[in-house]
Amino acid sequence: NKGVELSLSTINVKTRDFTWQTDWTFSTNSEKIKELANGSMQDTSGPWFVGHPINIFWDYKYDRIWQDTLEDNKMMQLYQKIGNLTFLPGQYKICDQPLEEVPEGTEGSKTVILDDGTKVSYMDNGFGRFTDDDKVIYNKSPKWTGGLNNSFTYKDWNFSFFTYFRFGNTYYGLSQTIGRRLEKDVWSPTNTNAKFAQPTTATRTSTYDGARNYTKGNMVLVRNIALSYTVPQKFLNKYGI
């Protein structure tokens, strides 16, 4: 576990009545598992992997939305024939091993017959079914965080605000697929570049839809906005305060 923390204060402008001061902070942290019990390189119950951080997600990766095209319909049939998986146009597609089509009879290949009688021979590299080999590692912790506080003082008035930065992490948000209000940008035959899947009650494989919920946690947030006034001491003295 290694990290760096830096802080810096600067006075950008200073006159008789006006001062602008900025306080900067920056931190980065890198953690990696060096070894696991019994010399293992991974423990999926954690999940923990040598060479990777402790605080991670280990899951499938969202690819795109299935389209109603010849190519995608062929792929969806292959998933049905190979892995008994039912996918539909307008639903979420998950990253898998690549489809490698080869001549029939190629060593290490398999052959399936599509509904129209077409034969498809492919390398048996894991395509068509989802296993641990298809999962990826998502880092929950940001690669770096930072902030800056700007303070502006004019005579007895002060205005300040704090800006927070965070980059390089992934979070899991259920609002992408569960409990979300009806979105306008959902897939349809006339809106094929939509961000969200088409609502449906059709029978399909939805086991892997959760992969859509992983989202980059990069953010810039302005908070702690404050405006204050300092009552002059002579005024307080005058009224005995």
Task: Please report, for each region that a protein language model flagged, where it lies by residue.
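Transmembrane beta-barrel strands of outer-membrane/channel proteins
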Residues: T22-T28, F152, F161-F165, P189, ...
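Conserved small-residue
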Residues: V4, I11-Y138
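Transmembrane beta-strands of outer-membrane beta-barrel pores
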Residues: T10-N12, F26-K32, Y154-D156, F165-N169, ...
